[in-house]
C-alpha cells in the first residue's frame, strides 16, 4: 500500500480522539502533522481552484494591511490558522490523485465519536472539571472527545446525511445528537430535512419526521443545569451580544478587515478556546477580512454548491449551523467538508 494511503487511514484513525490528540501547550494536533506529511509527499500533485486562492489572497491582504496595528509576531501567529485552513484544502487534490473511497472512513469517524460520546455521557456525565482547561462547563451533555456539544452535534448531522437513513447507524447518530442538547444542530437537521423534502417532494415524510423529532426532544431528561434546558435564554442573549461585538469590530476596518484570526487581540479573554472566533462564520470572515474577504468566501461557497446532492445537503447543514457557531472554520468540520467535496 502506498505511503499516502497509509497516512490517510492514519489520519482518520486519529481524528476520533478529538481534543485528546492535541499536543501539550500547543495549538497543534497530531492530525495536523499527518496532513503536513501528506502535503510534503504529494506537493507536485497539489493544484487548488482559483476560488480558494482568491480567499487566501484576501486573508493575506487583511493581515498585511494590519501589520502596524499588531506588529509582526502577532500577525505571524495569526497567519498560522490560515496555513492550517489552506493545508486542509490541500487534502482535496490529494484525495483526487489517490482515488480513495472516503465514505467508509467518514462513517467510521462519526460513529466512533458517537460511541465514545455515549460512553462519556453514561460514565462521565459531569464534565464541569474541564472548565479549568478553559473549556465550557457542561453537565449531562454528550461532548465525546470534542469537548463541544455544538460542533459535535453538527458532525452527527453530517453523518446522518452520509448514511442516508440506514437504520442502525442512523439510530446511533440520532440518539447521540439528541443528548448533545445542541439547538443549532437540531435546527441544521430540520433544515436539511426540509431541503431534501423540497427536492424529493416528500413533505409528508418530513412532517412526520419533524414531529417525531419534537416528541423525542420533549422526552429528553432534564437532570439539572442550564445546558440541558432547550428553552434556555442566556445563550441567546450571549450570542446576540457576540453578534453586536462582531459588527462593532467590522466597523473598525470594513473593507479589508482587522486581519484574519486576529480577534483574540480584541477580546477580554484571549486564552479562551472561543477567543479567536465569533458565533457566526460569516461575521467572523467579515470582521477579520472585511467586505473583500466575505465576497471571496461567498464565491468559494458558490463554487462548491454546484456539485453533488451529498455536498449540497452537507453544505446546508454547515451553513445553517455556522449562523450560530464558527462551524466553517472548525478543524474537524473543515476536514469533513473537503472530504465531501471530493466525494
Regions found by a protein language model. Give the residues of each.
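Hydrophobic alpha-helical transmembrane segments in multi-pass integral membrane proteins
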Residues: 18-61
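Transmembrane alpha-helices of multi-pass inner-membrane enzymes
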Residues: 36-41, 161, 311-323, 327-343
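Alpha-helical transmembrane segments of multi-pass inner-membrane proteins
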Residues: 94, 103-138, 144-200, 310, ...
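Aromatic-anchored transmembrane helix interface
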Residues: 54, 63, 72-97, 110
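A membrane-periplasm/extracellular boundary helix in multi-pass inner-membrane enzymes
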Residues: 115, 121-124, 180, 197-234, ...
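Long extracytoplasmic/lumenal interhelical loops at the membrane interface
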Residues: 230-244, 248-252, 256-289
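Hydrophobic, aromatic-rich transmembrane alpha-helices
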Residues: 34-45, 157-166, 291-308
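Hydrophobic transmembrane alpha-helices and their immediate junctions
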Residues: 190-194, 198, 203, 288-319
